[in-house]
Amino acid sequence: MITRRQSTEIRLGNLTIGGSAPISVQSMTKTDTRNIPATIAQIKELEECGCEIIRLAIPDMEAASALKSIRPKVKIPIVADIHFDYRLALASLSAGVDGLRLNPGNIGDPERVKAVVKSAKEREIPIRIGVNAGSLPKDLPPELTIAQKMVKAAMGHIKILEGLDFGLIKVSLKAFDVPTTIEAYTQIASLIPYPLHVGITETGTPKTGLVRSAVGIGNLLYMGIGDTIRVSLTAPPHEEVFAAYEILKSLNLRQRGPILVSCPTCSRTEVDIVGIASQVQEALNKIDKPIRVAVMGCAVNGPGEAKEADLGIACGKGQGLLFRKGEKIAVVPEDELVDALLREIASL
């Protein structure tokens, strides 16, 4: 059983993060924030997928102003992603965002940092310090490893906020390299009490990015590290949300929707099990029930091998078996197997 690191609790809109709260799933819009209708539509789609926190890039004042129209139209907490310009942070706070992602050390003048912190404190808005291995300060000691530099940079930003008596802090330390990311998070986890947002950055397209993210995020979560997660992919954001829940489900940390179990096929397979499994997965994506469903390619061994499944089909040429918890329910013609399975799921 996984024992989670105990972090302080913060509130992000209507969501509790840290402490004993469930690990939250986050994504980021891929739209131009200034395109208000497109951004609202994408956030609503993500809400339907189970996204619990959404981050929006705020490159200029027009984007910050757009938040005034976006915030009332969506339900989940909005985090404004700010780089360098403190005025964008102030405008985003005035627009009603639920959180900021910025590094106070990059803002410059201490008075500007104070202005942002003062506004955030008045509104009880948390700030996420987000350190990225690709954009570390140039003045860090060269003898340090990348992970050590990430931790040192994060601690510098944290001390600025703590020096202003601000404690609504969340921290992330992301790199493309999985071992570097794991090393950075394990180091900082023992140094600070604040919630940690976990992810691997710039992972690429789903084919490679899903693997890299699952290895990195999964390892950290198994060690009990992580209060929110994002699977960063060069793909539509709903794919990030789906992948995040699959990682959490695989570690028994969250349950949302069905889990599909399907065999890898072998020479005993006499049907298009790949196509059948894909068809079932597509249907399961529209179902919220936290059940385990099996699609097996062998009517002889399938039910026994998938006896942990709530429901399943074992496919044979011409016909197959519909089973529950490994016990046969019915023999079904091959071309009716998927429909029979879905009807049985609907009856649960």
Curated annotation (Swiss-Prot):
Q: Where is the signal peptide?
A: none
Pathway given in the UniProt record: Isoprenoid biosynthesis; isopentenyl diphosphate biosynthesis via DXP pathway; isopentenyl diphosphate from 1-deoxy-D-xylulose 5-phosphate: step 5/6
* Alphabetical list of Gene3D superfamilies matching this protein: Dihydropteroate synthase-like (3.20.20.20), Sulfite Reductase Hemoprotein, domain 1 (3.30.413.10)
Which InterPro entries is this protein grouped with?
Dihydropteroate_synth-like_sf, IspG_bac, IspG_bac-typ, NO2/SO3_Rdtase_4Fe4S_sf, RibuloseP-bd_barrel
As one GO molecular function, the record gives: 4-hydroxy-3-methylbut-2-en-1-yl diphosphate synthase activity (ferredoxin)
The UniProt keywords, alphabetically, are: 4Fe-4S, Iron, Iron-sulfur, Isoprene biosynthesis, Metal-binding, Oxidoreductase
Enzyme Commission code: 1.17.7.3
- What name has this protein been given in UniProt? 4-hydroxy-3-methylbut-2-en-1-yl diphosphate synthase (flavodoxin)
Organism listed in the record? Dehalococcoides mccartyi (strain ATCC BAA-2100 / JCM 16839 / KCTC 5957 / BAV1)
